[in-house]
């Protein structure tokens, strides 16, 4: 066991039972009158609530409060219904009113859950702390405290919280899963993988830890495509065993002549997220007579990007409250021809519902970079760079190549130029990396240190989540120090709003893309800001992404074939400020005119791909509609 996981397990002690019991009996509204005893009435309302008869439960809670306005349990439980309906302000007001009457650990706990759902992790963390003060050893509160701290950017504190859960309840599989998430944030890859493996061993029936394990594998220097695919196929076996796949659909398996393909996209990232950034431009140029889009959001979180793309969909359905069977039934009933998984094994995915085959043709694009392992998914959309023929064995799905890149970048809706080349004023070159710390493997640190040694006056600017924590800064500086790089040559900065983040590119002369997990969105953003990106060719879909984007931006000379070429190119480019200065003023125009940002061109290719896949599906196994 790693030290991080071993430390959690070593503190194991007594288990803590859950505090909320199931209702003992169920009744109907017609059985109740206000003359019933208060205990019986609240238990009846709770029974309705637990049976998911929310409207009836809400009515009864309100009747209780009409008779007894300071009934703390009714206020609290009515707040929970508000939470379930997404009425977060109302929910928090009701639960806070209950707390004012009767401070209770579970009230604070559920108030924390409301704050968490409403994207207020710092407030949520405070609620969970108060719950723990009232009930020491409150396992669920510690677990959710860790989740809130992680979302608030304090992964170190989150690790401590999850370790406390494991100390109280050593077989808490979800806590090990959450611990893995926090360790991954902190770039402790072996410990994260081990935590996920513990979660899978403790809760083998849960898809989430398996997905997280698969996702985390990609950060490891020891990644093995065959081992990854074997694990992905075990995930498929688990979810397929539970599914009841459809074999008939409410669509005609016939050529789509004179009417569009009905295409569903399942995603939790239809927002300010790489998925949102890469589909937004294309959506505006799809021909509705060819493709009719339907969104299936896996979570109810929306923002400005959501507001811009939502009108491009013929329908928008939330799957957040539906289990896989119900979600699959809904999609099938909607008559979807092609269903796209836009998440893969990333967070907020709903891959298990694809095992139900709610659509006759199922595709993975654009939110993942490897095989899902799902036999029910027919194709992965890629391109000749990310899915070369000699890597077909990495997938259970078939490859479908788009003519250019498989991605089309939407330029930010922010008026901001790249500014002058910094090294002209500074007198030295500044390399940059903006992204996750977990991508900075020991191999990357070694190669980048070689670059810095060969350009002795250069600086490296790293901007990453968690680097506003001095402990993380010292840890990263120590890794470079082990290769002889002085901390004075390093500049670290944490997360910032997107406009400030984009402005930070003005302080960089050229970007270094890591490997084997390169920058995707960050590569495109840098190019748009006039900052060229040096990439390294890899040996699987993920490690080819930067290569694909650079080819689509017409910058093939910025792709290195191996470590030595990467170092040589970095040194040569850094010593040629004249060329970098020209790129600074011309690169945005070049990128906007290149396939990388040509949304109309990409939309035609995307439509053609969907219709060609559909034609093959029709030819392969035509079936009558049910």
Which residues fall in each region the model found?
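Alpha-helical solenoid repeat scaffolds of the TPR/TPR-like class and their adjacent stem/linker regions
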Residues: 2-428, 446, 478-485, 492, ...
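Substrate-binding clefts and catalytic carboxylate motifs of secreted carbohydrate-active enzymes
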Residues: 432-443
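A short structural motif in glycosyltransferase catalytic domains
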Residues: 514-516, 535
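Short alpha-helix at the nucleotide-sugar/activated-sugar donor binding site of glycosyltransferases
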Residues: 526-528, 551
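Short glycine/serine-rich donor-binding loops of glycosyltransferases
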Residues: 522-523, 546
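Short hydrophobic "strand-cap" motifs at the C-terminus of beta-strands
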Residues: 266, 434-435, 463, 493
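A conserved nucleotide-sugar
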Residues: 290-292, 449-482
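Short acidic/histidine- and often glycine-rich active-site loop of Leloir-type glycosyltransferases
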Residues: 543-554
């Amino acid at each position: 066991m790693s030290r991080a996981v071993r430390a959690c397990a070593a503190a194991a002690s007594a288990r803590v039972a859950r505090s909320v019991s199931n209702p003992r009996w169920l009744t109907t509204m017609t059985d109740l009158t206000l003359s019933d005893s208060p205990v019986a009435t609240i238990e009846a309302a709770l029974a309705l609530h637990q049976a998911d008869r929310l409207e009836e439960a809400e009515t009864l809670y309100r009747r209780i409060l009409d008779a007894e306005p300071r009934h703390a349990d009714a206020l609290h439980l009515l707040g929970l219904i508000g939470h379930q309906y997404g009425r977060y302000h109302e929910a928090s007001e009701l639960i806070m009113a209950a707390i004012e009457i009767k401070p209770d650990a579970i009230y604070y706990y559920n108030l924390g859950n409301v704050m968490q759902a409403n994207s207020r992790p710092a407030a949520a963390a405070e609620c969970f702390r108060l719950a723990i003060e009232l009930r020491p050893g409150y396992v669920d509160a510690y677990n959710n405290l860790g989740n809130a701290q992680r979302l608030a950017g304090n992964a170190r504190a989150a690790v401590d919280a999850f370790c406390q859960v494991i100390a109280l309840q050593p077989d808490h599989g979800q806590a090990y899963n959450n611990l893995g998430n926090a360790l991954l944030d902190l770039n402790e890859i072996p410990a994260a993988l081990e935590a996920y493996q513990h979660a899978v061993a403790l809760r083998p029936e849960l898809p989430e830890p398996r997905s997280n394990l698969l996702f985390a594998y990609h950060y490891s220097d020891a990644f093995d495509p065959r081992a990854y695919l074997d694990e992905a196929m075990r995930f498929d076996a688990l979810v397929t065993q539970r599914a009841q796949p459809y074999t008939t659909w409410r669509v005609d398996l016939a050529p789509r002549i004179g009417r569009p393909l009905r295409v569903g996209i399942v995603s939790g990232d239809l927002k300010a997220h790489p998925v949102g950034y890469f589909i937004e431009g294309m959506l505006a140029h799809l021909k509705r007579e060819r493709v009719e889009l339907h969104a299936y959001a896996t979570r109810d979180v929306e923002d400005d990007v959501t507001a811009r793309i939502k009108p491009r969909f013929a329908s928008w359905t939330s799957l957040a409250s539906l289990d896989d069977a119900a979600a699959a039934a809904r999609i099938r009933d909607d008559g979807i021809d092609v269903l796209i998984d836009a998440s893969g094994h990333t967070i907020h995915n709903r891959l298990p519902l694809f095992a139900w085959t709610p659509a006759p043709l199922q595709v993975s694009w654009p939110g993942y970079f490897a095989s899902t392992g799902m036999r029910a998914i027919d194709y992965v959309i890629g391109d000749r760079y990310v899915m070369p023929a000699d890597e077909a064995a990495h997938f259970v799905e078939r490859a479908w190549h788009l003519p250019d890149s498989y991605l089309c970048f939407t330029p930010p809706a922010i008026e901001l130029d790249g500014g002058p080349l910094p090294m002209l004023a500074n007198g030295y070159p500044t390399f940059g990396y903006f992204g996750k710390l977990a991508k900075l493997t020991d191999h990357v640190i070694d190669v980048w240190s070689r670059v810095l040694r060969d350009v002795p006056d250069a600086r490296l600017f790293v901007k990453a989540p968690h680097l506003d924590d001095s402990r993380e800064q010292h840890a990263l500086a120590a890794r470079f120090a082990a290769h002889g790089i002085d901390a004075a040559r390093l500049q670290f900065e944490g997360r910032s709003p997107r406009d400030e983040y984009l402005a930070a590119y003005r302080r960089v002369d050229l970007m270094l893309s890591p490997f084997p997990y390169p920058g995707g969105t960050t590569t495109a953003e840098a190019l748009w800001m006039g900052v060229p990106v040096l990439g390294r060719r890899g040996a699987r879909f993920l490690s080819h992404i930067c290569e694909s984007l650079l080819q689509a931006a017409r910058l093939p000379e910025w792709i290195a074939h191996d470590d030595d070429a990467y170092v040589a190119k970095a040194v040569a480019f850094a010593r040629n400020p004249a060329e970098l200065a020209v790129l600074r003023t011309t690169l945005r125009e070049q990128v906007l005119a290149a396939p990388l940002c040509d949304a109309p061109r990409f939309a035609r290719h995307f439509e053609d791909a969907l219709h060609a896949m559909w034609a093959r599906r029709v030819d392969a196994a035509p079936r009558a509609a049910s």
